[in-house]
A protein has these predicted regions:
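N-terminal, polar/charged subdomain of small-to-medium soluble alpha/beta proteins
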Residues: 1-100
Length: 100
């Protein structure tokens, strides 16, 4: 059985939107992520090497989002999902990107 890791309300500024006025200044987006992970080994060893390093994932997502420029939130979400799966070995991810 897998546990669920949650990262909620990660706020990052980026260029996003289809209208000219949206693309003139960075807007804040809020990102929620959840992904399955078996935490048994990490719980036994109490070692960061045996778990998902949330800080590293958050730093990577922040860097990606800050450096990106998308018209659609869907494109940004797909980019984040690909980054997290490909770079950090997460097998699947549930993601929400919103402009508060």
């Amino acid at each position: 059985m897998k546990d669920i890791i949650y990262i909620k309300d990660l706020r990052v500024k980026t260029i996003i939107g289809i209208f000219d006025w949206e693309r003139k200044v960075k807007q804040e987006v809020s990102i929620d992520m959840e992904f399955p992970f078996d935490c048994k080994r990490a719980a036994k060893t109490d070692s960061i090497e045996d778990t998902v390093d949330y800080k590293t994932i958050c730093k990577g997502v922040i860097k990606f989002v800050e450096e990106s420029s998308f018209q659609l939130q869907e494109s940004l979400a797909e980019g984040i999902a690909s980054l997290v799966k490909d770079t950090y070995g997460v097998e699947s991810i549930k993601l929400r990107v919103s402009k508060p």
